[in-house]
Every structure is written in structure tokens, then in C-alpha cells.
Design a protein with these regions (language model features):
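A generic alpha-helix structural signal
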Residues: 1, 35, 39, 300, ...
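Positively biased amphipathic helices and basic secretion/translocation or surface-docking motifs
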Residues: 17-54
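Extended, compositionally biased eukaryotic interaction scaffolds
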Residues: 7-11, 26, 34, 75-76
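N-terminal amphipathic alpha-helical interaction or autoinhibitory segments
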Residues: 1-15
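A residue-level detector for the "anchor" residue at the start of short, highly conserved motifs
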Residues: 46-57, 68-359
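N-terminal low-complexity or simple alpha-helical regulatory segments
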Residues: 62-64
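Exposed alpha-helical structural elements
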Residues: 5-9, 33, 37, 279, ...
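Short helix/strand-capping connector loops at secondary-structure junctions
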Residues: 15-23, 317-324
């Protein structure tokens, strides 16, 4: 026989009053009203100085149904880390324009906002320094081999800089990169030496333009391409337009067509060619850093160069977690870290300029 308490509970559930009460609650959870409530709570949680639009990172972490609703509402991504305001409070700011120029005589010039407006006397010409660009095209003319003077520009961690060479070629240098180049090119030859990453817009002059790296040599006449040649990483030459010849220096060479990429593992001497979306590999010049199904360790290696940070992992397995996203190059890193946290696969804390990942 059922107990008296069970019978009372059954009678309560079956009562008109209980049914009406819960029917009202059910009606309260219609989708329109529900999402308005969510939006209200989200806006209350929005503590950040700048809004981060959902579409910046939505492909990485947010479920499809939330993508649709948030996109239609055109609302900002909430500060998703309830109870953990440390990531937002401890700002890690993006890099900026800065470099060090070493002249042929050994003199060094710091290129940053403090050097804006300064002039250099080179080859009898006044070279104007801007906070983001150094333009050598004013030092016109060509000289013989005996008179060549080489300068070297080095971009530190957390920096970027644009250089216009004597022939009008524009070079965008990424963080932790350097370029050695002549003040003026010798007759019939244009050659520079690159370490790190740079995006080249080569001016057509009728003479070959050669970029030498530790593992590859790229020869062009007039074209646009990106070279990534960081020590310890795969070397990549990505052709946007024109034509380039890639040579390993070990008897293997090939000619790239637009939208092709040549990659080389240092020391292997073996070049691999594939067709790629060039915008993915050159977007850093336009303010975005793209990642597609990449290991967390590789993602953070790239970001550490730009944000001037160190990265630690409490568990080696975390390095192999894969993500796809893009990061706005000129924003703080906190929104990206918060969205990593939102996956619930990984946790993040900041200790000064070190980012620590743990389970």
C-alpha cells in the first residue's frame, strides 16, 4: 500500500493549482523572452572597455545555435569567466611599431615613436624616420660593389616595422625578424638577407630581386609574397602575385605560381608545394593572425612573438590541443584567453608576462 506522504504528493501534482502554476512557468520560457533575459544578463556582465564582436572567435568555440541567436541580436560576447577577473585585470597589450637599425659603421638607431621626425644622413641624402616606416627610396642611384654599405634592421619581440628599400620595394617585417640590405643596390642586382617573417611588395625594375634565408633563396622580378623563416620552424614562401623561383641551395629549385606555397623543413632539402588561401598567411600585415586546426603550442609560439610573453604548460598534453580561430592583432590577448577557458578543456592564469595553461 502506498504511504500517506506519497498519496499526498500525488494529489498535489494532480491538483489544478499545481498544474496552473507550472503551466505559467512553462509559458515564461518562450524563446523570445528567454533570449531577452540572457541579453540583459550579458550586458550586466560586460565589464570590458572595448566590445569584442562574436564573429571574431565564434568559429572556434560557440555552439551553432548560439551563433545564430547572437548574430541576429548583434550583441557582444560576454565576459565569460565568472569569478575569474584576473585575465581581464592583468592586461597583456599587443605589440607595436619598433625596430633597431644598425648602420654600416656600427651605429645603432632606435626606431619607435620617440624617433618620429628624426633624419638620417645616408649616402648624401636625408632619410626621414617615421614611427612606423623607414624609407630609403630617397637615397636613389646605384653604386658599384666596392661602395656597397649594408644596414640591418631588427624587429624585437612585440614589434613590427615597415621598410622601403632603395628601389621602392616595400618590406613589412614581423616580430623577431631581421633584414640585412644594402643602402643602395649595385647595378643589375638586388639582394637582401632575411631571418624571421616578412611580407614583400617588390617593385619592378627589370632586375632580379633575391631574398636569402638560412634554408631557401627566393628570386623574383616584381611580385608580392610572404616568407616565414623562423629558426626551428618550417620555412614557408607564399606567393600572392607574380612569379618566384625557390632554391634550397642543395640542387632543388622550382617556380611558384600565384596561390602556391613552398614549404621546407630546415635541413631536409626537400621542398613541398601546395595551393593555399594566401590571405590566411598574409593577414598579419592587415591586423589579423589566423590559425586553422593548429596545436596550442604552435598558436602560442606565434602569439608570444607579438605579445612579448612567455608560455608555460602544467601538462605536456595541453600543447597538442587543436584550435582554429583568428586574433585581432591590435587588441589585448585577454578575449582570446577567455574563450579558450570557455571550451572547458583548458584553464588559464597570468603571472606577469607569463601565461600558464593547466587542466
Amino acid at each position: 500500500k502506498e504511504s500517506k506522504s506519497h498519496e499526498q504528493l500525488f494529489q498535489k501534482i494532480c491538483s489544478d493549482e499545481y498544474y496552473a502554476q507550472h503551466e505559467i512557468r512553462k509559458m515564461e520560457f518562450d524563446s523570445q523572452a528567454g533570449w531577452k533575459g540572457v541579453e540583459t544578463r550579458i550586458k550586466r556582465m560586460e565589464l570590458r572597455r572595448r566590445h569584442l564582436k562574436l564573429l571574431r572567435y565564434v568559429a572556434l568555440f560557440i555552439a551553432p545555435v548560439l551563433i545564430l541567436v547572437f548574430a541576429l541580436q548583434d550583441i557582444s560576447v560576454p565576459h565569460v569567466m565568472d569569478g575569474n577577473q584576473l585575465l581581464a585585470a592583468q592586461q597583456i597589450l599587443p605589440g607595436g611599431a619598433k625596430a633597431i637599425l644598425t648602420l654600416d659603421n656600427g651605429e645603432t638607431v632606435y626606431l619607435d615613436e620617440n624617433a618620429d621626425g628624426r633624419q638620417l644622413q645616408l649616402a648624401g641624402k636625408q632619410i626621414q624616420i617615421d614611427s612606423t616606416t623607414l624609407n630609403y627610396s630617397a637615397a636613389d642611384g646605384q653604386v658599384g660593389q666596392s661602395a656597397l654599405e649594408y644596414n640591418k634592421i631588427e624587429v624585437p619581440q612585440g614589434g613590427e616595422y615597415t621598410l622601403v628599400l632603395n628601389d621602392g620595394t616595400k618590406v613589412h617585417l614581423n616580430s623577431m625578424s631581421s633584414l640585412r640590405f644594402p643602402l643602395t643596390f649595385e647595378a643589375g642586382k638586388r639582394e637582401v638577407e632575411l631571418a624571421g617573417e616578412a611580407y614583400f611588395e617588390v617593385n619592378k625594375t627589370g632586375h632580379p630581386f633575391i631574398v636569402s634565408t638560412q634554408g631557401m633563396q627566393i628570386e623574383v622580378l616584381g611580385t608580392t609574397f610572404n616568407i616565414s623563416a623562423y629558426p626551428g620552424e618550417e620555412y614557408q614562401a607564399t606567393l600572392v602575385s607574380g612569379s618566384v623561383k625557390v632554391d634550397t641551395g642543395e640542387g632543388q629549385s622550382l617556380v611558384l605560381k600565384p596561390s602556391q606555397q613552398a614549404s621546407l623543413i630546415p635541413g631536409s632539402g626537400n621542398i613541398q608545394v601546395r595551393t593555399v588561401d594566401t590571405a590566411f598567411y598574409t593577414s598579419w600585415v592587415k591586423g589579423k593572425i589566423n590559425f586553422k586546426d593548429q596545436r596550442l603550442e604552435d598558436i602560442m609560439r606565434t602569439l608570444s612573438r607579438w605579445y612579448n610573453i612567455e608560455v608555460d604548460y602544467s601538462d605536456e598534453a595541453l600543447k597538442n590541443l587543436r584550435f582554429g580561430c583568428y586574433v585581432n592583432r591590435y587588441e589585448e590577448i585577454a578575449p582570446f584567453l577567455e574563450l579558450l577557458e570557455a571550451t572547458e578543456n583548458i584553464h588559464v592564469k597570468i603571472n606577469g608576462k607569463t601565461i600558464i595553461f593547466y587542466k
